[in-house]
Amino acid sequence: MKIIFAGTPEFAATALATLLKTEHEIVAVYTQPDRKAGRGQKLTASAVKQLALEHNIPVYQPLHFKSSTEEGLAAQAELKALNADVMVVAAYGLILPQVVLDTPKYGCLNIHGSLLPRWRGAAPIQRAIATGDTETGVTIMKMAAGLDTGDMMLKTICPIEATDTSATLHDKLAVKGAEATVQVLESEESLQKYLAEREVQDEALTVYAHKLSKAEAQINWSQPAAEIDRNIRAFNPWPVAFTPLDDSNNLRIWNSSLSTQQATAAVAGEVIALDKDGVHVMCGDQNAICITNLQWPGGKALNAVQINQTQKLSLGYKFT
């Protein structure tokens, strides 16, 4: 089949790379415009664009598809001229109006990083970890105009491990999403079958995964240890959990685990142990977490061994 692929970050690039191994023809790639990135603020192509260029696939980077502007109408016409059978969308980042969704022969399919209708929205991976879900997955859906409201064609489950961060879970789901997409698109007959058997989402089960903010990454040490640990792992790699230091700078905390250390007289936020595993800090429910990876202001991220070598923290230190 002739496929248009629309996506931007690594999550999408994983799916594109897998599709490129099939016999389908990727007639075009749509991705976000190049953005400034890094310390040098150089214009940088998205992961999807870089992969497309490596395979000599035409790349389109419209700002939008709005029917109210000449630019949007031109983008719509450009896409229509590709005469694609289907369009696969994964973390593209642009709103697609109904006219675009209806352009390919079989419409547009989306790879979403949750088991819909749970965790519709911008941050499904992070919210699943932070909430304490024990499993998540990917959903392949036929796109509709609403936010992640399309009919579900295939769902694949992925367990959430106690050690998972958003980074590690992202990578697992990217692979599962790619595999599920190839399964649906195994043949034109296969696609027709999945479309015919698609399932409407139950609105009563909808939970929204609202966009992350930097402010919510500040650790509240009065919370239970399990909740703090989940938040730390959910906010890795962005926005990264942090706690203020005495000098008004922030200590970034990249990873943690639940601790078995006890200290009956300790208060929430107090360092109760430092050992080969990391820094053990008391939380609001009189259980502790173990910080296993942290970053001092202006420095690099340190593992447990490196943390102890710096000797910057001591027993009794109190995070606020």
Outline where the language-model segments fall:
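An anion-binding loop in the catalytic cleft
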Residues: 220-320
